[in-house]
């Protein structure tokens, strides 16, 4: 599958379910709050899974593709169990391997705003 369609399919799966099927075993995961690269599929499934569980909707605002790499600006509508909602823009940098598996993701977003949201502020 070409990389653009692959990324679009992944983001559709974030909305509808099944995103886990895209993730390779050998995976690198980076976040804006750390220089550390987390390694392994399970680490990503846990971290992204907690975030995606709050997501009511993901809208891809911009998508740039070069080879097997993708840069996306996405808007997530998040909701806490209390009903409180937040729209959060997230820059996501993805890399797919030749077998169409997601092998790397680095994300950037306003962590302060997200933490306040999680604290119910």
Model-derived features: positions:
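A short hydrophobic beta-strand element
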Residues: 67-76, 88
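Short, low-complexity N-terminal intrinsically disordered segments enriched in polar/charged residues
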Residues: 1-17, 21, 120-121
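Short, cysteine-centered beta-strand-loop-beta hairpins and adjacent loop/turn segments enriched
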Residues: 53, 78-87
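Short beta-strand segments enriched in hydrophobic/aromatic residues
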Residues: 76-78, 109
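A solvent-exposed, acidic/Ser-Thr-rich amphipathic alpha-helical stretch
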Residues: 5, 16-68
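Short beta-strand edge/turn micro-motifs at domain boundaries
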Residues: 93-118
């Amino acid at each position: 599958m070409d990389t653009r369609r692959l990324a679009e399919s992944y983001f559709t799966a974030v909305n509808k379910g099944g995103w886990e099927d895209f993730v390779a075993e050998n995976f690198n995961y980076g976040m804006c709050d750390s220089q550390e690269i987390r390694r392994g599929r399970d680490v990503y499934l846990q971290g992204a899974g907690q975030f995606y569980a709050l997501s009511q909707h993901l809208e891809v605002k911009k998508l740039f593709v070069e080879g097997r790499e993708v840069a996306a600006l996405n808007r997530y509508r998040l909701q806490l169990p209390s009903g409180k909602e937040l729209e959060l823009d997230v820059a996501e940098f993805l890399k797919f391997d030749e077998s169409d598996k997601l092998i790397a993701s680095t994300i950037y977003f306003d962590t302060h705003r997200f933490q306040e949201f999680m604290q119910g502020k």
